[in-house]
Amino acid sequence: MRVIRLFFILILLMALLPSVVRAEEPIITADAAILIEATTGRVLWEKEGEARHYPASMTKMMTTILLLENIDPAEEIFISPQAAMTENTSLGIKAGERLTAKELTTGMMMVSDNGAAVAIAEAMDGDTATFAKRMNAKAKEIGMENTNFVNPNGLTDPNHYSTPHDIARLARYAMENDDFRQIVQREKETIYWSYPNGRFKNVINTNELLGNYEGITGVKTGWTNAAGGCLTASAKRNGLKLIAVVMHSKTEEDRFSDMRKILDYGFQHVHMVHGFSKEELSRRIFIVDGRMGTTVARPIEDVEYPLMDGEDPSHCSIAYDAPRIVTAPVSGKDVGKVIIKYDDKPVGSVALHSERVEEGFSIGSFIVSVFGWML
């Protein structure tokens, strides 16, 4: 009889085991979400990560990075009547006013001002439609494969969409920019106008995780009736950098509780292991542009792999995706990447950065080196 009881207990435990494993994964209200490791871009967990949804104000991450890469932060931006009349100008900007690019962008990101995004688009390209073309070109450049922008602020439009994975790609790219990181990690700020002189406004970041979640470093909220609750968040603990995105959470508050569950899951079940030093991954690349030369390309930092609980570091490998010959100028630029694989499947990548250029070698050595590499 005792043996029979033990047998049935064992059967019961085996039946419960799958549900116990599944229970470890985050249970969220959002229709779609993703968690990636920021350094490599490896997808660690997802729920409909490639599904299209309205990105709402997470769109403003693209508007911000385009401004930071193309406009002097001290340049003054004029507020047009169209910008001032845009739905939800939470900064309270008015037609005829002026703010520096830095102040306007900071205010836009912290309190999600839609009119500020329009003013930025007009300052850069004259109108929002032309600016949207710039946004889509940048999206393609950074690998956002299933995204289309039609405005700079994320107001609902049937043709304005993205996916959790694409938004995570955008956040990963943008968080490499020092000015962007400084903006999105601020809890409070005072925004000053250039004209009228003396006007200012104290603002509080709409990202409620700032100051309330260990290791949080950004990044952007979003909400419309059609988009539901949206949130992109980044956090760092013990050297592990995570980026997560939720789209179409049921309520504005649910997006924060959903995000906590996802980030908690990542920090509990993911760890970084050392792979290769940046010196080990150095790559000599030839430069041809009048005079010939070479550049040394390597990752900016030593390469580490993100592994889930139970994964074996010996299953990790790398491959290069970089040309052997490039045209100048390349100094200080990314010239390829190291592909990180697990069980021979690509799971992430790290950029190869051109650190220095050496000029002056013979055509003979060039031919021998290049053709020797090909052989």
PLM regions and their residue ranges:
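Sec-dependent N-terminal signal peptides of Gram-positive bacterial secreted proteins and lipoproteins
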Residues: 2-23
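Structural motif marking the loop-to-transmembrane transition
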Residues: 3-4, 55, 101, 363, ...
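Hydrophobic alpha-helical segments, especially transmembrane helices
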Residues: 3-6, 61, 237
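Short, flexible loop/turn motifs enriched in small residues
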Residues: 6, 25-31, 225-229
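Sterically constrained small-residue positions within well-ordered secondary structures
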Residues: 14, 24-26, 235, 328-329
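Residues in and immediately flanking transmembrane alpha helices
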Residues: 15-18, 73, 195, 274
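Active-site-adjacent loops and short helices of periplasmic peptidoglycan-processing enzymes
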Residues: 21-183, 193
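Domain-terminus/edge residues, biased toward the C-terminal soluble/receptor-binding domains
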Residues: 145, 158-161, 165-375
